[in-house]
Regions:
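N-terminal Rossmann-like NAD(P)+-binding domain of SDR-like oxidoreductases, especially those catalyzing
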Residues: 1-103, 143, 153, 235, ...
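Nucleotide-sugar-dependent glycosyltransferase donor-binding/catalytic pocket residues
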Residues: 11, 106, 138
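A general lysine-centric signal
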Residues: 41, 77, 112, 216-218
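Residues that scaffold the ATP/ADP-binding catalytic core of kinase and kinase-like folds
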Residues: 53-54, 106-107, 220
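A glycine/serine/threonine-rich, flexible loop-to-helix segment
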Residues: 57, 110-118
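Hydrophobic alpha-helix immediately C-terminal to the catalytic Tyr-X-X-X-Lys motif of short-chain
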Residues: 79, 83, 87, 117, ...
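C-terminal substrate-binding subdomain of Rossmann-fold SDR/epimerase-dehydratase oxidoreductases
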Residues: 115, 121-266
């Protein structure tokens, strides 16, 4: 959402920022003969959004899927991926790229769907859902993602790209209704119900479906997502219920201004 309102910030951060990081790493790690220190590797963490959108036909994103970004954010990430690939090809720079699906879990900033819905429901606020709510995302629990990153850092072949997916495809409206049901059952609060759901105008450039095939990282490194969504969402809700003070702190000030601006006409 932020990239739609202010794309320049994302270009500066994701494109120019990646270029700065690459240049700094190259300067620090390059040896006089043009090779690089053997114990160094640059890991570029990217997104499945660079691949565009999938139809609801059982297809998946693979490492060989052509890039087709649809938003300023995904275009900036695609550009940064290409920069890393260019350094690998041009300088034999020691790097890997990972493209992951939607993360969720503890400490996620509340502009993201799952913490946003949890926070709003606890406060009795409306739960904004874009369009018909049937956009599908592949949900990856954050600890599973961290394990994948560790495996790629320590075992990934230089120059390779690895897709990291959760095998947990769910429509957004399913996510929202699941959170409502979980909170209602735990808190015995009749105010937390599906009546809070408010469908709002669809987001510009909103991709319909994402789905990653993680076969390559499974075969090469032995990684596979361990956390089914039904378990991960319980762990996530537990964490936010146990850390309401953190949520109150993080949603004050600048975030509150952003939230009000984003949804003021919806």
């Amino acid at each position: 959402d932020r990239s739609i309102k202010n794309p320049e910030v994302f270009v500066k951060t994701n494109v120019l920022g990646t270029a700065v990081m690459l240049n700094c790493a190259k300067a620090a790690w390059e040896l006089p003969d043009g090779t690089f220190k053997a114990d160094k590797k640059f890991l570029h963490v990217s997104t499945d959004e660079v691949y565009g959108s999938l139809e609801d036909d059982g297809s998946y994103f693979y490492e060989t899927t052509p890039y087709a970004p649809h938003s300023p954010y995904s275009a900036s990430k695609a550009s940064s991926d290409m920069l890393v690939k260019a350094y690998i090809d041009t300088y034999k720079f020691p790097a890997n790229i990972t493209n992951c699906s939607n993360n969720y879990g503890p400490y996620q900033f509340p502009e993201k769907l799952i913490p946003l819905i949890i926070n709003n429901a606890l406060q009795g606020k409306k739960l904004p859902v874009y369009g018909d709510g049937k956009n599908v995302r592949d949900w990856l629990y954050v600890e599973d993602h961290c394990k994948a990153i560790d495996m790629v850092c320590n075992g990934g072949k230089i120059g390779e790209v690895y897709n990291v997916g959760g095998h947990n495809e769910r429509p957004n409206i399913f996510i929202v209704k699941t959170i409502i049901a979980q909170l209602h059952d735990r808190l015995k609060d009749d105010g937390i119900s599906e009546d809070l759901i408010k469908h709002v105008a669809d987001r510009l450039g909103h991709d319909r479906r994402y789905g990653i095939d993680p076969t390559k990282i499974k075969n090469d490194l032995g990684w596979y997502p361990e956390t089914p969504f039904e378990k991960g969402i319980v762990l996530t809700i537990d964490w936010y219920l146990d850390h309401e003070e953190w949520m109150e702190h993080i949603t004050s000030g600048n975030y509150q201004k952003y939230y009000e601006e984003m949804y003021k006409n919806k």
